[in-house]
Amino acid sequence: MNPNQKILFASATAIVIGTIAVLIGIVNLGLNIGLHLKPSCNCSRSQPEATNASQTIINNYYNKTNITQISNTNIQVEERASREFNNLTKGLCTINSWHIYGKDNAVRIGEDSDVLVTREPYVSCDPDECRFYALSQGTTIRGKHSNGTIHDRSQYRALISWPLSSPPTVYNSRVECIGWSSTSCHDGRARMSICISGPNNNASAVIWYNRRPVTEINTWARNILRTQESECVCHNGVCPVVFTDGSATGPAETRIYYFKEGKILKWEPLTGTAKHIEECSCYGEQARVTCTCRDNWQGSNRPVIQIDPVAMTHTSQYICSPVLTDNPRPNDPTVGKCNDPYPGNNNNGVKGFSYLDGGNTWLGRTISTASRSGYEMLKVPNALTDDRSKPTQGQTIVLNTDWSGYSGSFMDYWAEGECYRACFYVELIRGRPKEDRVWWTSNSIVSMCSSTEFLGQWNWPDGAKIEYFL
């Protein structure tokens, strides 16, 4: 063929191929339209009835990957709307020993990973899961900003949560609210989180509900407004929370606030015989909330607040038992005090907890009487009311050769069963002030839950070697 014929042949071939491609595309488009408009598919875009909204969404969009998250969101919204407020209808399960529940090894992993500096940790559950919580310092353990994180209050702290038994990292942590003191709890429908921030003489609390700010509370004594540092508890939507504002080494003003959906229903000043209240650890059962607190002013015995969330009233006293559970503390006396602080804490203390259930009562405390080291659980029947009650059983959680710290109670109120399983956590503090070869202060967490079996014990230390950080 001559050149002109070659050009004509090539052009004709291209036209034929292009025409075939267009026809294939038209056929493909027609098939797709036909498949999506077949009679068995409900393709209406109108708002589905509320009673079957999630099912309609799944039928319409189950095979569209880019819509999957929207479908899940709609399902979650409907489930949340249909959930009921949690009611504290059960009693505590019999406690014969404690089994391991969670451990995050945060400091060990933080030696070579982006783990956040935290303190004041706790555990809290909702109908779907339980998560670790803590106050972050806005830096990682290996970050240069970790220098000075021994200080409790700064603009860089936030309440974060992360999956159970994972370390808190910059990738898996969720910020709940901003502040240097906190509490958080779920009422069965949504979570309420409270964070306190600001200068010592002008701090304020912001109450979040369902991830939105709802209410604010201003300082009333202008001396470090503060709250529980562990989970609150809700009954039929009413969530009592204990706040203190005032001196840590003298008289302070404590209030119990009653919230519903983040809004204040009522507040009342502390009543009863407790003289000083800080950092309460609360649990709920049989339509009441019991909080074991810290008397930082005078008491080596712990004050207890018993709250009726239905009547929205409370009373307070001290644990009567001579088994003292604060730190520092003197040696256990022969007779305890029910309505007065037992002296010997030297204007100091540590957050702690107890489960006060008659003959099923267990108290937690550091093993050391002088420093935050070791941890043990002691069964002390009738400790709340008997001023001569003594331990009948015990379990070591952390040996006295290892550091401990704050501790607190929590329960999974949505777990199956005829009773509530008691649980607790222990903060394992590392770094300053005791380990001053490093510049930071942080912690890991170990948590345990009760068992009706008589289980063996083991040491559950933080486990990080400080020399690896030098």
From Swiss-Prot:
<keyword id="KW-0325">Glycoprotein</keyword>
<feature type="binding site">
    <location>
        <position position="294"/>
    </location>
    <ligand>
        <name>substrate</name>
    </ligand>
</feature>
<feature type="topological domain" description="Virion surface">
    <location>
        <begin position="28"/>
        <end position="470"/>
    </location>
</feature>
<feature type="disulfide bond">
    <location>
        <begin position="93"/>
        <end position="419"/>
    </location>
</feature>
<feature type="binding site">
    <location>
        <position position="153"/>
    </location>
    <ligand>
        <name>substrate</name>
    </ligand>
</feature>
<feature type="transmembrane region" description="Helical">
    <location>
        <begin position="7"/>
        <end position="27"/>
    </location>
</feature>
<feature type="topological domain" description="Intravirion">
    <location>
        <begin position="1"/>
        <end position="6"/>
    </location>
</feature>
<keyword id="KW-0326">Glycosidase</keyword>
<keyword id="KW-1032">Host cell membrane</keyword>
<feature type="region of interest" description="Involved in apical transport and lipid raft association">
    <location>
        <begin position="11"/>
        <end position="33"/>
    </location>
</feature>
<keyword id="KW-1015">Disulfide bond</keyword>
<keyword id="KW-1043">Host membrane</keyword>
<keyword id="KW-0812">Transmembrane</keyword>
<dbReference type="GO" id="GO:0016020">
    <property type="term" value="C:membrane"/>
</dbReference>
<keyword id="KW-0472">Membrane</keyword>
<comment type="function">
    <text>Catalyzes the removal of terminal sialic acid residues from viral and cellular glycoconjugates. Cleaves off the terminal sialic acids on the glycosylated HA during virus budding to facilitate virus release. Additionally helps virus spread through the circulation by further removing sialic acids from the cell surface. These cleavages prevent self-aggregation and ensure the efficient spread of the progeny virus from cell to cell. Otherwise, infection would be limited to one round of replication.</text>
</comment>
<feature type="glycosylation site" description="N-linked (GlcNAc...) asparagine; by host">
    <location>
        <position position="147"/>
    </location>
</feature>
<dbReference type="GO" id="GO:0004308">
    <property type="term" value="F:exo-alpha-sialidase activity"/>
</dbReference>
<feature type="glycosylation site" description="N-linked (GlcNAc...) asparagine; by host">
    <location>
        <position position="87"/>
    </location>
</feature>
<feature type="disulfide bond">
    <location>
        <begin position="125"/>
        <end position="130"/>
    </location>
</feature>
<feature type="glycosylation site" description="N-linked (GlcNAc...) asparagine; by host">
    <location>
        <position position="63"/>
    </location>
</feature>
<feature type="glycosylation site" description="N-linked (GlcNAc...) asparagine; by host">
    <location>
        <position position="42"/>
    </location>
</feature>
<feature type="active site" description="Nucleophile">
    <location>
        <position position="406"/>
    </location>
</feature>
<keyword id="KW-0106">Calcium</keyword>
<feature type="binding site">
    <location>
        <position position="348"/>
    </location>
    <ligand>
        <name>Ca(2+)</name>
    </ligand>
</feature>
<feature type="disulfide bond">
    <location>
        <begin position="185"/>
        <end position="232"/>
    </location>
</feature>
<comment type="subunit">
    <text>Homotetramer.</text>
</comment>
<feature type="glycosylation site" description="N-linked (GlcNAc...) asparagine; by host">
    <location>
        <position position="66"/>
    </location>
</feature>
<feature type="binding site">
    <location>
        <begin position="278"/>
        <end position="279"/>
    </location>
    <ligand>
        <name>substrate</name>
    </ligand>
</feature>
<dbReference type="GO" id="GO:0046761">
    <property type="term" value="P:viral budding from plasma membrane"/>
</dbReference>
<comment type="similarity">
    <text>Belongs to the glycosyl hydrolase 34 family.</text>
</comment>
<feature type="disulfide bond">
    <location>
        <begin position="423"/>
        <end position="449"/>
    </location>
</feature>
<feature type="binding site">
    <location>
        <position position="372"/>
    </location>
    <ligand>
        <name>substrate</name>
    </ligand>
</feature>
<dbReference type="InterPro" id="IPR001860">
    <property type="entry name" value="Glyco_hydro_34"/>
</dbReference>
<feature type="binding site">
    <location>
        <position position="299"/>
    </location>
    <ligand>
        <name>Ca(2+)</name>
    </ligand>
</feature>
<keyword id="KW-0378">Hydrolase</keyword>
<feature type="glycosylation site" description="N-linked (GlcNAc...) asparagine; by host">
    <location>
        <position position="202"/>
    </location>
</feature>
<keyword id="KW-0946">Virion</keyword>
<dbReference type="GO" id="GO:0005975">
    <property type="term" value="P:carbohydrate metabolic process"/>
</dbReference>
<keyword id="KW-0735">Signal-anchor</keyword>
<dbReference type="GO" id="GO:0055036">
    <property type="term" value="C:virion membrane"/>
</dbReference>
<feature type="disulfide bond">
    <location>
        <begin position="280"/>
        <end position="293"/>
    </location>
</feature>
